[in-house]
Amino acid sequence: MNRIANYVLATAFSAGALHAASLPSTNTTTTYRRVQVDGIDIFYREAGPENAPTIVLLHGFPSSSREFDTLIPLLATKYHLIAPDYPGFGLSDAPSPAAYTYTFDHLAQTMSDFLEKLKVGHYTMYLHDYGAPIGFRIILAHPDQLHALIIQNGNIYKAGLGAKWTRIAEYWADPNAHPEVLNVFLSLEATKERHVAGTSHPARYNPDTWISEYADLSRPGQREIQGDLLYDYRTNVASYSEWQAWLREHQPPTLVAWGAHDPSFVAPGAEAFRRDLPKSEIHLLDAGHFALDEKTDEIAGLIIQFMAKHPG
């Protein structure tokens, strides 16, 4: 009897393995890769035909390239998608601040070197949250490589800074005197709020998302890493006027798809792009900071329409 049971199990496992081995891999299949960049192991997602127009997806805080999991399959039939995790985020290496200086300048340099390593020299950039200051540094260093911009709650205007930034500015003035600001910034409550604040559809939000992000923030060394980056964020605000001037001069095709209920980067930050980019497309969505949480289909549709108007 045992021999019969073993035979049945072996047959089932063999059939399953054969079926798995025969499953086709298509250009729309997301692949999960790693590459060494400046001594750092960088994790990234990739999908779509390599000869298609490339969209580089730069994630926000405290997420990773995983925030694009629902968007990538909707775009991968037409575009080549690359979504890296920054050092200190997601599945990329997180060296200590003694081994890697956590500034937005340094993250941008590492991501620029990452794109060079992958031989990606012409792209549209999708910038969310932290992706905006990282992306604009890359763009200003390599303006000839940019085809178009997709901005999703990625702020470069003082008008876009929500009320919470008043307290963060106190942290910038003296981090040691305001540890409570960093405590709140890294808390589970704040991590959840970045997703659900202002939404009228809380049941559409998967709690696994912020629980996982909070687990990442609770890893050894993360307080120091994220504290350094929060302190360095002041350099982004100081750079806003430079980035705005670049937009006015170069007028890249730009799509702004902005969650209107974001308490961090409020709606006037989206509308301000029109001042410097009169031809930009601006859409305020019934969503929050992580607009992809509930507006993936709508954002994908906007991107496909936008890219069709600006081929290349």
Question: What residues fall within each predicted segment?
Answer:
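Bacterial N-terminal signal peptides that target proteins for export
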Residues: M1-V8
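Hydrophobic h-region of N-terminal signal peptides that target proteins for export
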Residues: T11-A21
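Flexible "cap/lid" subdomain of the alpha/beta-hydrolase fold that forms the substrate-access gate
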Residues: S22-R33, G39-I42, A47-T54, I82, ...
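Structural cue for short, hydrophobic secondary-structure segments
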Residues: L57-G60, A83
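Active-site glycine-rich loops that stabilize anionic/oxyanionic intermediates
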Residues: G60-S63, D129
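Alpha/beta-hydrolase active-site loop signature
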Residues: P62, P87-G90, I156, G288-A291
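Serine-hydrolase catalytic-loop signature spanning alpha/beta hydrolases and amidase-signature enzymes
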Residues: P62-T70, L81
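Catalytic histidine-centered segment of alpha/beta-hydrolase-like enzymes
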Residues: G288-A300
